[in-house]
Design a protein with these regions (language model features):
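Transmembrane alpha-helix boundary and packing residues in multipass membrane permease domains
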Residues: 32, 36, 114, 118, ...
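Alpha-helical transmembrane segments and their short interhelical loops
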Residues: 91, 95-168, 210-222, 227-230
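Short cytosolic juxtamembrane segments of multi-pass membrane proteins
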Residues: 236-243
């Protein structure tokens, strides 16, 4: 009950910043439109709408990292959170309270991307629903990573780290813009060791109905999601003790 009350407060706080929220929801759509236009003039298999849309939905989750990091960092710098530290809320309650309102936003962003892609030629099938459900583990990872960064860094720092560095890393290491096999070597190995490319490949597999292939990518995403969530809770608890 205490956790849900805090989650409700966080949801209201997120909605108080509609500009950043609209940017996070709208920017993936702009990319989808631009790359679809590029595909129409210079055909590239990677940018075909059925291949592109699943990747864009995964890339869009990087903005959830920025949202969650900024929310926690702002609260840490305010007197409100210091007062909340005196309540019976645990570190897990705080982390889940931040995460719960962001998950529907992440899923909403994914739904909007798929709906937006339909007029652009996206194949309509029940697999879209599976792809939306399948993106949840990666959404948890992105949100938890933001909570971890927000527990460590200040507001200005998370803007540069999560808004700039992480967004670019997730784009380059996910294989959305280019085939990682074309680069190969150490770069491809690093990408394979991280969850981004696995999330993109899983989304593509779910959308195409290849559930066997999708299952091969679930484990690394799940492990990263659990590990980062635990790290976020631990770091938040340390900050509570310091303050």
């Amino acid at each position: 009950m205490r956790m849900m009350t805090f989650a409700n407060r966080c949801a209201k706080e997120i909605l108080r910043d509609p500009i950043n929220l609209c940017f996070g929801l709208g920017f993936p759509l702009v990319l989808l439109l631009l790359l679809s236009a590029l595909q129409a003039n210079i055909p590239v298999s990677l940018f075909e709408i059925d291949m592109l849309t699943p990747g864009i939905t995964v890339f869009g989750l990087s903005f959830m990292t920025l949202f969650s990091a900024t929310l926690v960092a702002k609260d840490r710098e305010s007197a409100l959170l210091q007062r909340l530290y005196t309540t019976p809320l645990t570190g897990f309650d705080f982390i889940m309270g931040y995460m719960l309102p962001l998950l529907p936003i992440a899923l909403g962003q994914t739904v909007i991307c798929y709906l937006f892609a339909i007029p652009l030629g996206l194949t309509i099938s029940i697999n879209i629903v599976y792809a939306i459900i399948g993106i949840i583990p990666m959404a948890v990872f992105n949100i938890a990573l933001g909570l971890l960064c927000g527990s460590i860094f200040g507001v200005k720092q998370v803007g540069g780290i999560c808004g700039g560095l992480f967004t670019n890393l997730s784009a380059w290491l996910s294989g959305v813009w280019f085939d990682l096999k074309l680069v190969g070597g150490v770069f491809e190995k690093i990408a394979d060791a991280l969850p981004f490319v696995h999330a993109v490949e899983m989304e593509k597999a779910l959308f195409s109905g290849d559930f066997g292939l999708a299952a091969t990518h679930v484990l690394p995403i799940a492990l990263y999601s659990i590990a980062i969530t635990v790290m976020a809770v631990v770091c938040f608890l340390k900050q509570m003790k310091k303050q």
